[in-house]
Amino acid sequence: MSTTIEIPESSKVAKGKAVAVVAPARPGGWKKGVAIMDFILRLGAIAAALGAAATMGTSDQTLPFFTQFFQFEASYDSFTTFQFFVITMSLVGGYLVLSLPFSIVAIVRPHAVGPRLFLIILDTAFLTLATAGGASAAAIVYLAHNGDQDTNWLAICNQFGDFCAQTSAAVVSSFVAVVVLVLLIIMSALAIGKP
């Protein structure tokens, strides 16, 4: 047996207005957007760093004329600074690939501080490495373009134009990676610092 209670609607009951209660926005919701941007910037930095290493590593030019005893060739492995550049940019690119899972964790858990702190520390270390490699290669590229009259070093880019164009492009690409790493560090620091 079931008992039902009928309540008729009455027009005598005054209708009132209730206060709309909206759930407050979760603080720090913007951190997920920062984490997604972090991931995208990491992909760009990977392309810039590995592109710089590949461009420098394949820079090679042989002049069409040669003598009986000499052949004029310019290659990245003729300069230890360029070898250092290829190694450092390869290391930076490899680190950035290995940092992608931590960036994904920051997307899934935007309020987790551990992965961001870990990335800030390693990003800073590899930023230093990328800056050192890029700056040292930039100095040699400058000498290749302009030479130095005081030390009697001649500019070689008049003869080895393709080689100089490739090395210059590699240096520019490395500094793009450096700028992206700086942006990554700033974004991660802001995400950790603000609630």
Swiss-Prot record:
Topology relative to the lipid bilayer, per the entry, is:
Multi-pass membrane protein
Instruction: Answer whether the UniProt record assigns the keyword tRNA-binding to this protein.
Output: no
A Gene Ontology cellular component where this protein is annotated is: Casparian strip
Superkingdom, taxonomy of origin = Eukaryota
Annotated localization = Cell membrane
| Cytoplasmic compartment spans | 1-33, 105-116, 193-195
Provide the transmembrane region boundaries.
34-54, 84-104, 117-137, 172-192
GO BP terms in the entry = cell wall modification; cell-cell junction assembly
Task: Identify the keywords attached in UniProt to this record, alphabetized.
Answer: Cell membrane, Cell wall biogenesis/degradation, Membrane, Transmembrane, Transmembrane helix
The chain's disulfide connectivity reads: none
Q: Which residues lie on this side of the membrane: Extracellular?
A: 55-83, 138-171
PANTHER family reported for this sequence: CASP-LIKE PROTEIN, CASP-LIKE PROTEIN 1U1
Family, as annotated: Belongs to the Casparian strip membrane proteins (CASP) family.
Q: What does this protein do?
A: Regulates membrane-cell wall junctions and localized cell wall deposition. Required for establishment of the Casparian strip membrane domain (CSD) and the subsequent formation of Casparian strips, a cell wall modification of the root endodermis that determines an apoplastic barrier between the intraorganismal apoplasm and the extraorganismal apoplasm and prevents lateral diffusion.
What binding partners and quaternary form does the record give? Answer: Homodimer and heterodimers.
Q: What is the name attached to this protein's record?
A: Casparian strip membrane protein 1
| Organism from which the protein derives | Glycine max
